[in-house]
């Protein structure tokens, strides 16, 4: 079937498509992801004018890579599925775009050639491709992870195997996935003396997406590793505590309630997950013509204002724990501000927020309003 995206026309797998194997994948629900990719590339081009080449490492029908090519990037698309390669070539010709489409496994292609920007968008975990990407990506590494159950701790053993970390399925499980992924990528980069700086990261609709600026220097890799640490989480009162460093120092009892049902997670990325100035630059490069323009701008505005502290709270989950009705989020955050704490909405859902207050301090600051 034919679809239009970003002003281009593509043939993609569908019931009405003839001659296209079912193994070639196209997900219309990922249009926000692709729109943000284009806007991010536009912002990054301004940040680093020397970046020119872009690898779409798992191209499938070619939509993401061809949209980058339409913006002037020197694009290589590769896929190990021959039917996908054929379809990507047809779509390039259909849109009169000069793109190098190669029939190759992503790891093989990355070991063969270096690129300024590398985009990993696999089905499932990106970690089997991370080492090759860090070895051959010069500037910007774009990564999608769709295996959110392992990342967030719902499929614990799979998460440990894939990411070399202990994930926990908490009430802030989307952010757990974000920070487990960033930790694994930072550790992978460090093996190549590459440091990572997350410019934009979000958890949306059952996937995590991050854009990492790379610096090839041992001291940069060391600095990234210093952003790693562990987390202690109390299952009884939802208190959590973050500890920097690769050697965990777990709590024996909860400082807030005295409980002993504590979960430990890590290593996690405890540093910032976004650069607010870059996020604003991406937002400014979303045109009205994008189908997801309003949704994308709303997401980016929330990310720009989101506090850089780990980890978020869910207001409704806290109120349920306390046996109190939830009030308007703006009023809730205002109470925290009046009590002297920093607080912001978080992008994970409409009821999530971030603050530098502990769970006990949150309750003390908001209890009067919640009880009215």
State where each predicted segment sits.
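SAM-dependent transferase fold signal centered on methyltransferase-like domains
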Residues: 1-372
């Amino acid at each position: 079937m034919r679809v239009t995206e970003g002003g281009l026309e593509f043939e993609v797998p569908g019931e009405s498509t003839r001659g296209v194997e079912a193994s070639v994948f196209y997900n219309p629900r990922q249009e926000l992801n692709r729109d943000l990719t284009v806007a991010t590339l536009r912002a990054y081009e301004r940040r680093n004018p020397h970046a020119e080449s872009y690898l779409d490492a798992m191209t499938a029908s070619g939509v993401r890579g061809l949209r980058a090519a339409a913006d002037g990037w020197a694009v290589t698309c590769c896929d190990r599925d021959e039917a996908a390669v054929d379809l990507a070539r047809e779509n390039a010709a259909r849109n009169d775009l000069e793109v190098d489409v190669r029939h190759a496994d992503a790891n093989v292609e990355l070991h063969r050639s270096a690129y300024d920007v590398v985009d990993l968008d696999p089905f499932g975990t990106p970690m089997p491709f991370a080492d090759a990407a860090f070895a051959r990506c010069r500037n910007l590494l774009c990564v999608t992870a769709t295996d959110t159950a392992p990342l967030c701790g719902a499929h614990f053993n799979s998460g440990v195997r894939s990411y070399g970390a202990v994930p926990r399925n908490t009430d802030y499980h989307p952010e757990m996935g974000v920070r487990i992924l960033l930790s694994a990528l930072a550790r992978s980069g460090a093996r190549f003396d590459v440091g990572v700086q997350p410019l934009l990261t979000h958890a949306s609709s059952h996937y995590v997406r991050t854009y990492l600026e790379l610096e090839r220097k041992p001291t940069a890799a060391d600095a990234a590793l210093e952003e790693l640490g562990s987390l202690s989480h109390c299952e009884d009162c939802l208190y959590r505590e973050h500890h920097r460093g690769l050697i965990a120092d777990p709590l024996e009892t909860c400082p807030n309630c005295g409980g002993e049902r504590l979960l430990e997670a890590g290593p996690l990325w405890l540093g910032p997950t976004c650069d607010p100035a870059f996020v604003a630059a991406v937002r400014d490069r979303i045109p009205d013509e994008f189908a997801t323009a309003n949704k994308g701008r709303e997401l980016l505005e929330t990310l720009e204002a989101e506090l850089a502290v780990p980890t978020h709270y869910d207001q409704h989950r806290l109120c349920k724990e306390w046996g109190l009705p939830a009030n308007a989020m703006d009023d809730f955050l205002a109470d925290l501000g009046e009590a002297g704490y920093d607080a912001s909405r978080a992008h994970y859902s409409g009821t999530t927020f971030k603050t530098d207050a502990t769970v006990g301090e949150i309750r003390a600051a908001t209890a009067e309003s919640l009880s009215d």
